[in-house]
Design a protein with these regions (language model features):
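Glycine-rich, basic loop-to-helix element that forms the pyrophosphate-binding segment
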Residues: 72-87
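A conserved acidic beta->alpha catalytic loop
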Residues: 39, 50-59
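Conserved donor NDP-sugar-binding/catalytic core segment of glycosyltransferases
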Residues: 76, 100-127
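Cell-envelope/extracellular polymer assembly enzymes that use nucleotide-activated donors
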Residues: 19-21
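Short, well-formed alpha-helical segments that are part of the catalytic scaffolds
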Residues: 24-42
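Active-site acidic Asp-centered loop
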Residues: 51, 95-97, 104
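Acidic helix N-cap motif at the loop->helix transition within catalytic regions
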Residues: 34, 55-64, 104-105
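Short aromatic/hydrophobic "clamp" motif used to bind/position activated sugar donors
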Residues: 92
Length: 127
């Protein structure tokens, strides 16, 4: 389920909107990575950190307008913390390749980043 870029272009173009990076962590996720990345194309930056997959994960990731990095796996927290030092924006959403960001959530995040200067974080319940 790809988030339609045209549906959220106005939110992305909002002046003074805080920008957001998305971090996606992967290892042998060729079955999931394309759908995951399609669901976050609304973000200002996407960084995928792969743990040297032996399947087509990295090749698929390279077909998207994202940054692909590889790093030996030292645990989930270590991968995500390492990736945090490599993104450009203060706002960061971290997801695994088997997760998706529904369009409604993308709109809500972008709306709040564009309209609520007091917001300082999100809690997103996993379903």
């Amino acid at each position: 389920m790809a988030v339609k870029q045209s549906a959220i272009e106005d939110l992305r173009a909002a002046p003074d909107r805080k920008k957001i990076s998305v971090i996606v962590t992967t290892f042998n996720e060729e079955a999931n990575v394309a759908e995951c990345l399609e669901s976050v194309l609304w973000a200002d930056e996407i960084v995928l950190v792969d743990s040297f997959s032996t399947d087509r994960t990295v090749a698929i990731a390279h077909t998207f307008p994202i940054t692909v990095l590889q790093r030996q796996y030292f645990g989930s927290a270590a991968q995500k913390n390492w990736a945090l030092d490599r993104v450009q924006h203060e706002w960061v959403l971290i997801i695994d390749a088997d997760e998706r960001v529904p369009e409604a959530l993308a709109r809500e995040v972008l709306t709040l980043l564009a309209t609520d200067p007091a917001i300082n974080g999100f809690y997103i319940r996993r379903e």
